């Protein structure tokens, strides 16, 4: 019969080696007596040994997995190992799904004039290509003499403009008001298309039926970038329409301060009179007087009283 001292019970030095190490039913000399039940202290000691053993095994695994970089070969091995690891975890590229956006299909039916002009306004190049491939006239127009090039310039479809010009669209084609595509580009405020047309040889000082120039149109619409480019390309800054108005008259009338400053900067004349014998300065005074009269007329009105 084995005897266990009080110190051994307290310190837990003698543990059940049969349970911890052998595990095969072989009696361990000096172990716990048969039929002996483990107490709380012995159970704690047993758990400590388990934790220490697990930590030791983890440390061994970590040390065995480390690479020493003593020479160039070790570095190459490390690089190859990392590369293989990335390849294992690399996500393969997704194949295009069958539900992806369908490509625009070329219509089988012939494209009529109305559909052709509408396609130019809506930038539907497939319809344009079909119309031109079937021998359609790129200069075809509606009852107001508006062509596909007019619409493309107004809406800002630069690629379509290039395609129509390459197909033979006339750059000086005029609508019912004698306005060329340059007018329409200025109306839409599309500087890139305006540059394309002028570089192609379009007239910068063309006049419509009321003698307005592209400069007048750019000022009326407030597109100062188009205005400045027209001036730099040789636009007549003091050109007058049928009413005798210059671009400066229009800038004052519409209250476009930036356009007014640009015109004055480039040398627009202040003393040019229109048909009503008004200079831009007088027009500004009348405009201010009209605003003042409108305000004074509503002083004390119940609807405008604070």
UniProtKB/Swiss-Prot annotation:
Q: Which UniProt keywords apply?
A: ANK repeat, Coiled coil, Nucleus, Repeat
Location in or out of the cell: Nucleus
Region feature (Disordered): 78-107
Outline the ANK repeats, range by range.
144-173, 177-206, 210-239, 243-272
Please indicate if the UniProt record lists rRNA processing as a keyword. no
Q: Which SUPFAM superfamilies match?
A: Ankyrin repeat
Q: Where is this region: Interaction with TTN?
A: 179-196
Look up the coiled coil feature and give its residue ranges.
Answer: 41-90
Query: So which domain of life are we looking at?
Result: Eukaryota
Under the subunit heading, UniProt states: Interacts with titin/TTN and MYPN.
* Record protein name field: Ankyrin repeat domain-containing protein 23
Q: The organism's lineage?
A: Eukaryota, Metazoa, Chordata, Craniata, Vertebrata
Gene name, please?
Answer: Ankrd23
């Amino acid at each position: 019969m084995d005897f266990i001292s009080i110190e051994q019970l307290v310190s837990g030095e003698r543990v059940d080696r049969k349970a911890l190490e052998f595990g095969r039913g072989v009696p361990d000399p000096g172990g716990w007596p048969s039929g002996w039940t483990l107490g709380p202290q012995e159970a704690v000691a047993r758990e400590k040994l388990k934790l220490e053993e697990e930590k030791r095994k983890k440390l061994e695994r970590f040390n065995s997995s480390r690479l020493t970089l003593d020479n160039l070969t070790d570095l190459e091995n490390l690089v190859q190992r990392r590369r293989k690891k990335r390849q294992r975890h690399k996500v393969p590229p997704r194949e295009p799904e069958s539900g992806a956006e369908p490509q625009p299909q070329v219509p089988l039916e012939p494209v009529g004039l109305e559909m052709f002009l509408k396609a130019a306004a809506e930038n539907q190049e497939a319809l344009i290509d079909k119309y031109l491939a079937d021998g359609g006239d790129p200069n075809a127009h509606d009852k107001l003499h508006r062509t596909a090039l007019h619409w493309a310039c107004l809406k800002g479809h630069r690629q379509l403009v290039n395609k129509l010009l390459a197909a033979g669209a006339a750059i000086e084609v005029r609508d019912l008001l004698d306005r060329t595509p340059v007018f329409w580009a200025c109306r839409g405020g599309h500087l890139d298309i305006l540059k394309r047309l002028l570089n192609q040889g379009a007239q910068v000082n063309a006049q419509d039926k009321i003698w307005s120039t592209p400069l007048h149109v750019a000022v009326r619409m407030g597109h100062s970038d188009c205005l400045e480019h027209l001036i730099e390309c040789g636009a007549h800054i003091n050109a007058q329409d049928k009413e005798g108005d210059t671009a400066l008259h229009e800038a004052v009338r519409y209250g476009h301060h930036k356009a007014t400053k640009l015109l004055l900067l480039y040398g627009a004349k202040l003393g040019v009179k229109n048909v009503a014998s008004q200079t831009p300065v007088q027009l500004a005074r009348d405009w201010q007087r009209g605003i003042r009269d409108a305000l004074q007329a509503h002083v004390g009105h119940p609807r405008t009283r604070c």
